[in-house]
């Protein structure tokens, strides 16, 4: 469904073809293995990994070539999505990072993630602070806010967030 512009409200056919390649090591802080699904250096039941994709999207017969970056979120087994999950993923030419916060009523805040400056070793985050505002009325401007991250090495990473685009999912 088109959410803005002259075709707003119309339903258009969409096709997507992507070739996906890992561009960094997998990240995991949890332990775990599943039969026929294990590795020596990281938990295979849950991990994230920076990726780059190339391909094309066809919307209503119009083809657009794509080169995009993102984060592979691999979960094997149940994941309790009824908790307050917040993710911040950045993946560019200089670095990749993932910051996660999980809020469970009555429990201390769970925060984790990684920062990987390309050409350097991946660093675990010891603290994540995500201060976000959500705009439910406009999916194209759905979130704004700030973040403050602390790596185990002492490196600090701070920034602000401003939506430049968005869509309903």
Mark where each language-model region is.
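Structured soluble/peripheral alpha/beta segments that form catalytic or ligand/cofactor-binding pockets
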Residues: 1-169
């Amino acid at each position: 469904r088109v959410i803005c512009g002259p075709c707003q409200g119309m339903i258009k056919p969409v096709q997507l073809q992507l070739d996906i390649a890992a561009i960094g090591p997998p990240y995991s802080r949890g332990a775990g293995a599943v039969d026929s699904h294990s590795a020596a250096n990281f938990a295979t039941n849950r991990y994230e990994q920076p990726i780059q994709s190339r391909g094309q999207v066809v919307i209503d017969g119009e083809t657009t070539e794509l080169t995009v970056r993102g984060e592979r979120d691999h979960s094997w087994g149940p994941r309790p999505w009824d908790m307050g999950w917040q993710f911040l993923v950045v993946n560019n030419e200089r670095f990749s990072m993932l910051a996660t916060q999980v809020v469970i009523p009555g429990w201390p805040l769970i925060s984790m993630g990684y920062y990987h400056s390309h050409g350097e070793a991946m660093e675990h985050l010891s603290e994540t602070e995500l201060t976000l505002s959500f705009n439910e009325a406009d999916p194209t401007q759905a979130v704004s806010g700030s973040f403050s991250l602390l790596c185990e090495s002492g490196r600090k990473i701070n920034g602000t967030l401003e939506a430049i685009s968005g869509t309903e999912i």
